[in-house]
Design a protein with these regions (language model features):
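Short aromatic-cysteine micro-motif
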Residues: 2-168, 270
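C-terminal, surface-exposed recognition/capping segments
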Residues: 96-99, 131-147, 153, 160-163, ...
């Protein structure tokens, strides 16, 4: 068992979900893959062709709202995943949940052998956005599909350095997360924002605790302010062609539009 906080000590807010304190959460091992028949506009859209597994093309070209509603639809009655809505909550990754995973890479539970010796997570540099592909951190874009998640090369791109970690957090596609500046809807597709428990709202130009300000520039990972009305939504990790700028601590801003190099991932918590 892994204990993240000491007794009587408050956990980082990734483990607070609404009014509940979580002991943990399940984070998508790969970027969401599969297809959608059409963009999701509510929590009951058809997500029967959505998958979270290696060696598939990630789901892209969706606005933030479509990714969000797709993740929420995974627990609807009669879903193909076996989820029971009274037992679990499925949702799109929030920025602080990404941050919690990023922090763990910099620990003995991730890429560190001790308190001072850590290695960077490798990049998914596949030009077809195939999930679970990986190479060394500074590798250039490649069409090669043989560096799959269970090979020696691809384990470089795991958050733990072995097959049990999380993939596609460096490179692949830029991952939209539910983090926004001053509740600015912009081009996200939302008519109104969902319950606050499903997103992080930022009102200042810097913020610690979500692997943003305090880890800015680590491993030379790309960073750019999202604190503008034109790019209020967080995207994380970079994409396959960003080379050494890619990484779990990379972040940038976007309007929320349905870009071809934008993907997402989902999270499960107990209800």
């Amino acid at each position: 068992d892994v204990t993240f906080v000491k007794q009587n000590e408050t956990a980082i807010d990734a483990f607070t979900f609404g009014d509940k304190q979580l002991s943990g959460f399940w984070y998508g091992k790969f970027e969401i893959g599969g297809t959608l028949a059409s963009s999701c506009t509510n929590e009951t859209c058809n997500v029967s062709n959505i998958v979270v597994k290696p060696n598939v093309s990630s789901l892209r070209s969706q606005k933030v709202s479509s990714f969000f509603y797709a993740a929420r639809s995974m627990e609807q009655t009669g879903n193909s995943f076996g989820f029971v809505s009274s037992e679990v909550d499925t949702h799109m990754s929030k920025n602080n949940e990404w941050g919690a995973v990023a922090y763990l890479t910099q620990s003995i539970y991730g890429r560190c052998t001790n308190s001072t010796t850590c290695t960077e997570v490798g990049i998914n540099n596949n030009t077809s956005y195939i999930t679970g592909i990986g190479d060394k951190p500074s590798s250039t874009a490649s069409s090669v599909k043989t560096n799959t998640y269970n090979t020696i090369s691809e384990k470089n791109a795991s958050t733990t350095g072995n097959i049990y970690g999380i993939y596609d957090m460096s490179g692949g596609a830029w991952d939209y997360v539910m983090g926004v500046y001053k509740k600015t809807i912009s081009d996200s597709g939302f008519r109104s924002l969902p319950d606050i428990k499903y997103y992080n709202n930022y009102t200042e130009s810097s913020y610690t605790g979500h692997a943003i300000s305090e880890t800015k520039g680590w491993y030379n990972d790309q960073s750019f302010s999202v604190y503008f009305s034109v790019s209020p939504w967080f995207i994380r990790g970079c994409f396959y062609d960003d080379g050494e700028l890619s990484g779990v601590f990379a972040f940038y801003g976007s309007s929320g539009i349905n870009g071809n190099n934008r993907a997402s991932r989902f999270v499960i918590t107990n209800e």
